[in-house]
Design a protein with these regions (language model features):
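A short acidic, helix-capping loop that chelates divalent metal ions and anchors anionic groups
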Residues: 62-65, 129-135, 142, 192-195, ...
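Alpha-helical scaffold elements lining the catalytic groove of polysaccharide deacetylases
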Residues: 69-76, 196-211
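N-terminal, active-site-proximal structural segment of metallo-dependent hydrolase catalytic domains
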Residues: 2-113, 132, 303
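Metal-dependent phosphoester-hydrolase catalytic domains
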Residues: 29-43, 211-218, 226-303
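Active-site-proximal beta-strand elements of phosphoester/diester hydrolases
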Residues: 51-65, 157-159, 180-192
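Active-site beta-strand/loop signature of hydrolases that rely on acidic residues for catalysis
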Residues: 53-59, 78-110, 148, 174, ...
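Extracytoplasmic/secreted cell-surface and envelope-processing proteins
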Residues: 64, 106-109, 166-169, 192-195, ...
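Structured beta-strand-rich core segments of catalytic domains in phosphoester-bond hydrolases
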Residues: 37-40, 44, 96-180, 188, ...
Length: 303
């Protein structure tokens, strides 16, 4: 657990009733910042403070994962993490979530959870050769990334990222008017031999995400595959602050990826936020049995 810039009040933001919206498969864009950046930037001086309690988690929801064959249990565990995760030594209720390797069926189940029924959701599918949506092998719909917010979310988009044809990647993005913030969730190409073993596509994907720096308030959450010291992450560390980086902007942070024994082995999960925001961040020291990644939670204060 770290408090890299400022230990902020751990207050949940109460959201009004939200209309659930989901990104359509044809809603791809090349430049998110060109559509919403000016509207948020013009109001920069007048923006009220906002606190976003955000959690990012690669839930490993497909077949071959710890709970891949038990989707109902995985959805319950996600909801439990949202109800209370440790940040800055306190248990905090989350009002935003970024999920990776999640199936559309899991999101549908979460929408029926009592506490989450009023949340807004954005979903962006992973794709196979030719651009077809990648199906979850466990019958849970489409595999992809999702963003959920307690407050209403608008301008929901699927942001297609440069990717190898066999494993198409996208970011799911939406704007929360109550926070005057743009949120994007992503999972970059993996280092598998048949995906992006040399990292050339991840570099291009990170470059595309860097365009979001034009926004006044931004949170980008997800599994970036790379470790903090990787040069591939240089553009993001220059443009944003990472919630768990150490003093003097050192690129550190608690490890989020764990091996089959539950031992943490690397930090590959991140919450990049606007540098004007303050944040407190936390990763559980207890192994999770639901995934090969531990959730990363943060309280972000936009001032």
């Amino acid at each position: 657990m770290r408090t890299p810039r400022a230990l902020i009040p751990l207050l949940a933001v109460a959201g009004a009733a939200a209309v659930v919206v989901t990104a359509g498969a044809g809603a791809a864009i090349e430049n998110v910042s060109g559509t919403t950046g000016p509207a948020l930037a013009d109001a920069a001086e007048a923006l009220p403070p906002a606190t976003v309690n955000a959690l990012t988690w690669n839930v490993c929801g497909d077949t071959g994962c710890p709970m891949g064959s038990r989707p109902g249990e995985l959805a319950t565990e996600i909801a439990r993490q949202l109800a209370g995760s440790e940040v800055g030594g306190r248990t905090v209720s989350m009002n935003a979530v970024f999920l990776q390797e999640v199936c559309s069926g899991h999101v549908d189940t979460l929408k029926r959870e009592q506490r989450l029924r009023s949340w807004s959701w954005a979903f962006a599918p992973s794709r196979t050769t030719g651009g077809a949506e990648r199906a979850c092998a466990n019958g849970q719909g489409t595999l992809g990334v999702a963003v959920g917010t307690e407050a209403p979310m608008s301008d929901v988009r699927e942001m297609r990222l440069p990717s190898p044809d066999r494993y198409g990647r996208s970011a799911a993005c939406g704007t929360v008017g109550a926070w005057n913030a743009r949120l994007c969730g992503v999972q970059l190409s993996s280092s598998q031999w048949d995906d992006d073993p040399r990292g050339q596509w991840r570099g291009k994907q990170i470059g595309a995400l860097g365009e979001l720096a034009a926004e006044n308030r931004v949170i980008i959450g997800g599994d970036f595959t790379e470790r903090p010291e990787s040069p591939a992450l240089d553009p993001l560390y220059r443009a944003f602050a990472e919630c768990d980086q150490g003093p003097n902007e050192s690129r550190t942070g608690a490890m989020t990826q764990q091996d089959w024994r539950g031992t943490p082995v690397a930090k590959t999960d991140y919450l990049f936020i606007s540098k004007t925001a303050g944040a407190s961040c936390g990763v559980s020291g207890t192994p999770t049995r639901a995934s090969d990644h531990r959730p990363l939670a943060a309280a972000v204060s936009f001032r």
